[in-house]
């Protein structure tokens, strides 16, 4: 009997069956005004309301018969199965740049907790005030006391899209661009290696977190079983895209091409999925500002050749997408419509960041009324979720999910 695949993503729109999320937790309560920028936030969310909104989001998916898995639960279960808390903890502490006696304090303190509480503390951050009184021997310990954390919080973890992405039956476990997020993919690596749901399968890792160049899941879109679209953005390096293409062409039996699309390197356009998402077989939502008035932008077609990679530059974005999807025409639905003010406002609040749960059916933030009405006018079924606090982290429904299994399109 053939074992069911633990991972299977061959499109952006196939009926979503299993998804990985992270419920916002105490890591959000360790954000302070002084460290907003370094933790990649513009404001401090209200956690209680944020959790209510996230629970509503999860319920919306469950009501559509989607299996919703939680990162924090799977990580604790995987850590228990690994039966080696100290090894994972040592690696986490090292990547947090803790050295000398402070690393020993942190390790000994966290080793005293069970797996659930250890994972919670690794995610929420470890304040210096939490560890019992310790003798300071070194100059750096005495001078660095004003900084409140041994381990920084990971408040962006509820955006599970970025640390990893499923392509086909394999995965990219990503090297994140910002230091504030770099440890996030360690939890995905732990789960895939040790959780019984995944550990008994040979899951190809197309790109690992030890890669030299940054790659993030918000820039990875699986258009069909033969084509991956990757944004070259503020967070994803062109060299990472090329290395990913080489890996896919040499190890994946189905991927024939990788499309690299260049988008402006700004915070508001931090990933491709903040400006472009697939909502149906031949329909996408797009932020008009990423193209010129002729609808052009730089897109590169990477294909395997006898001499390695063949790269073909193009400018006609819409036509390229139509060609690879074998569609006569592609409908681009503008985020916020044609009004530049409305478009900019709704894109900032993730109006283009839709999560497709089936062909022609999406989840969006309720606040983006113009974009949602345009989607409905184009025949798309829209489920709106409450979003006043979730949106403060600069990510939408697609950002908050890592799809693990979708049905293949017929």
Swiss-Prot record:
BP GO annotations: arginine catabolic process to ornithine; arginine deiminase pathway
GO molecular function terms noted in the UniProt entry: arginine deiminase activity
Cellular localisation: Cytoplasm
The protein's Enzyme Commission number: 3.5.3.6
Catalytic activity line of the entry: L-arginine + H2O = L-citrulline + NH4(+)
Principal localisation: cytoplasm
Pfam family, one: ADI
Cystine residue pairs: none
Top-level division of the source organism's lineage: Bacteria
InterPro entries to which the protein is assigned, alphabetical: Arg_deiminase
UniProt pathway annotation: Amino-acid degradation; L-arginine degradation via ADI pathway; carbamoyl phosphate from L-arginine: step 1/2
Protein's UniProt keywords contain Hydrolase: yes
EC class name: hydrolase
Database matches in Gene3D superfamilies: Arginine deiminase, L-arginine/glycine Amidinotransferase, Chain A
Keywords: Arginine metabolism, Cytoplasm, Hydrolase
CC terms in the record's Gene Ontology section: cytoplasm
Annotated catalytic residues: 399 (amidino-cysteine intermediate)
PANTHER family cross-referenced by the UniProt entry: ARGININE DEIMINASE (PTHR47271:SF2)
HAMAP family: Arg_deiminase
NCBIfam families (UniProt xref): arcA (TIGR01078), PRK01388.1 (NF002381)
Family listed: Belongs to the arginine deiminase family.
Protein name per UniProt: Arginine deiminase
């Amino acid at each position: 009997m053939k074992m069911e695949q633990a991972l299977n993503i061959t499109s952006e729109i196939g009926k979503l069956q299993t998804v990985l999320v992270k419920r916002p937790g105490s890591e959000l309560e360790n954000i302070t005004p002084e460290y907003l920028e370094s933790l990649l936030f513009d404001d401090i969310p209200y956690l209680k309301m944020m959790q209510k909104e996230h629970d509503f989001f999860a319920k919306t998916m469950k009501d559509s018969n989607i299996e919703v898995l939680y990162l924090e639960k799977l990580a604790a279960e995987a850590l228990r199965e690994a039966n080696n808390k100290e090894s994972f903890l040592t690696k986490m502490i090292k990547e947090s740049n803790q050295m000398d006696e402070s690393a020993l304090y942190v390790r000994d303190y966290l080793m005293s907790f069970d797996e659930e509480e250890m994972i919670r503390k690794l995610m929420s951050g470890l304040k210096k005030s939490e560890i019992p009184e310790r003798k300071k021997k070194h100059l750096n310990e005495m001078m660095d006391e004003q900084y409140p954390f041994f381990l920084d919080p990971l408040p962006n973890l509820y955006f599970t899209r970025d640390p990893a992405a499923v392509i086909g039956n394999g995965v990219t476990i990503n090297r994140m661009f910002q230091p504030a997020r770099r440890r996030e993919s360690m939890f995905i690596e732990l789960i895939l290696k040790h959780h019984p749901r995944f550990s008994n399968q040979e899951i190809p890792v197309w790109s690992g977190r030890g890669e030299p160049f940054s790659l993030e899941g918000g820039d990875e879109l699986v258009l069909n079983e033969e084509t991956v679209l990757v944004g070259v953005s503020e967070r994803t390096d062109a060299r990472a895209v090329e290395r990913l293409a080489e890996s896919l062409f040499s190890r994946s039996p189905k991927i024939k091409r990788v499309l690299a699309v260049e988008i402006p390197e700004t915070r508001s356009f931090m990933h491709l999925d903040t400006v472009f998402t697939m909502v149906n077989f031949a329909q996408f939502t797009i932020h008009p500002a990423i193209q010129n008035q002729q609808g052009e932008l730089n897109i590169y077609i990477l294909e395997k050749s006898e001499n390695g990679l063949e790269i073909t530059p193009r400018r006609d974005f819409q036509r390229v997408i139509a060609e690879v999807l074998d569609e006569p025409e592609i409908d681009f639905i503008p985020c916020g419509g044609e009004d530049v003010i409305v478009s900019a406002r709704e894109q900032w609040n993730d109006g283009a960041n839709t999560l497709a749960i089936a062909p022609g059916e999406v989840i969006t933030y309720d606040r983006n009324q113009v974009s949602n009405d345009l989607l409905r006018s184009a025949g798309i079924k829209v489920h709106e979720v409450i979003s006043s606090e979730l949106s403060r982290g600069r990510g939408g429904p697609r950002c908050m999910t890592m799809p693990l299994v979708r049905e293949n399109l017929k």
